[in-house]
């Protein structure tokens, strides 16, 4: 059967030992923009990978995830992978702010897109119920980025369907449940700006108790827990489904071993969102008005974080047909004072609600647009690191590692810190693999980047910040 045009297949050369079948792990990584299925061997090497866009259905009751399309793609891809290796585990890794309401048969309502605009009147009602920031470390966010608001809206708008729900499943656990039939809850998805969790106490929030949702959440399981075997697929009858994890937290897993989380350092996980997770940063620095929050890592510990929609904003600034720039393009924009001022996405970030704009001479070529996008994302990342009080080395993971200049510009903006680029472009995939091999820490391969020599960069940075805070 030919593969659909929306899927991208990436085969890898596979070495079979004579007389042996390769044992492998599958990581299902569902990001907001794309979904990816990766087959990895026992050493973490990629054997095969397939991707497809993660699309939102705008029709129906409300904008929602096309779960059936993803399910059909997943089943077809698993069948292909089963012919390449013996799959012993499947690990779901997904974006946050998403949950499924299910009964024993399946979804009772479509899974709401967190970028949906919800009624302001209802949001005002919800504001009276949500826990204080000091308890949840979850800021009030636009659209449906607070999962508690999504659930409140669904309960008020579709009470009959909501009443049928047996479980509320955060998104990684929905896919685990769909694969193996075992319902579970897990702290990394409960603890990412949901209003549902108290990170410092490790318990459900007052909102959950007020709404009487506690019985709907299945028992808590560790992200690495094997929930059960895959159902309904004889080729995968010996394959265990793991509980799964929130994608940004998957990128942090390698830093949780051997008490590494106690040493000051920052992981900048990049994709649709750029999320700075600062180990050792103080939680009392978090500003709920600036999209600062505490995510909860796989061990249940709060980690100070700040974020902006870096991948989304980069795409807007770089244009529909991005062309990688040269250092000369970046230097030219710095010299002429071309600035991109936040923000260029409608959801989240410290400057949400402000309209992005360009001041100074406009970029003229595709390469200059790419250069401006790179400068903007580096300046935003630098701003977030300062706000967090992030100390120690910085490691960039995810999609920005493909940008040949981003980390070098960031290093130039932060002369007191090492800025490294992970050689594993997908920290989420590595993190998913680690859950199946818990305790087997892969070698951390990262390249410390030399700061890009740019005349006038310090003045350019000061000018950018002066525009953001004109009275400062």
Protein language model features and the residues they cover:
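Active-site core segments that coordinate phosphate-bearing ligands/cofactors
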Residues: 27, 127-139, 152-165, 170, ...
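Short, acidic/turn-prone active-site loops that include or flank metal/cofactor-
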Residues: 52-57, 113-120, 191, 272-274, ...
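Short glycine/serine/threonine-rich phosphate/pyrophosphate-binding segments
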Residues: 94, 148, 251-252
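Short beta-strand-loop/turn "lid" adjacent to the catalytic site in phosphate-handling enzymes
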Residues: 82-115, 139-145, 172, 176-198, ...
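A conserved helix-loop-beta module that forms one wall/lid of the active-site cleft
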Residues: 209-225
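Short alpha-helix plus adjacent loop in nuclease-associated cores
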Residues: 116-131
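N-terminal glycine/serine-rich phosphate-binding loop of ATP-dependent small-molecule kinases
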Residues: 3-111, 120-121, 135, 164, ...
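Conserved phosphate-binding loops in N-terminal lobes of ATP-dependent enzymes
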Residues: 36, 76-89, 144-153, 158-159, ...
